[in-house]
């Protein structure tokens, strides 16, 4: 029986010949990811009677959501995490400044083809850029994995997205993701496995590809998968933490839904307040005043994203009365951007550069907006209150558009500067 990626990988992990959508399977993940919520998970783990975690080598723990600590309460949370990591002998621990969990997991060769990554973060599908099954789970579920090493999952139905052709210059995978979310809705892939196929996907760099599975959390997906090709395998040479086996869907597998897009028809898109699926062409909202521009996050804080923004900012300055905040997704990206001269470009333009981490994306620190202010961001969410106050507005866009908007003080296409 032909199998989709999700059906095939979950069958393998459960020791079965095949699975079908809706079937319940018990698996042991290859990677269990947690971040600042490790401290409350530890509390649940202890209440369960847990003493030692199952396989310390399986866990990857990050401090990234509120890092460095903006309050004493956050600092205490970080202390608990560090004590837990030392007590349990966790091998893969990434402290303040190392970067955002999803980005660093890929950089460190911990997100691998044919493996299962379960994380206590809704954007864990990001790992699908490397051909892994990445899925977000709850805190009690993660505590259970710590205790017994297993978790049950319902095999998801699968959606196939085919993107033909090639994106036009100036159009990015962020625009493609927003276009699809706008078309299919915030629940368009609810508890589904979203697979990406077509020549347009193959043309994309790994950095551009990563935005796609990351954004599928905003469509309700359980996981999202891009078939690993030579680009992915070359990236993993000398980087992969262990041997892996690529798992691909069968050519004649059955998909609950199939959607085909022509890449050349995609234009720069904007997600407008207050939902990610409130998507409009850039041309429809051009000229909208902004107070702040934010470049970063696990969605678009990689070197290629910073390069696109730096190109726009060269020879320009951030508009008077507008703030621009730049946060590289990891220390590796920060270092590479420094060497490439991008950070100097940002500084010359009047932007503020912060240490790697999530920053204001979820309203913790490093540039949360004031009441009544408008932000444009490269992040993945713009729910009311996402960046702090519920009395602000957040627009989502690609890195180049965010940079151009910072220069203009209003939502702007780079070509119009």
What does each model-found stretch correspond to?
Residues 1-417:
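Fe-S-dependent hydro-lyases/dehydratases of central metabolism
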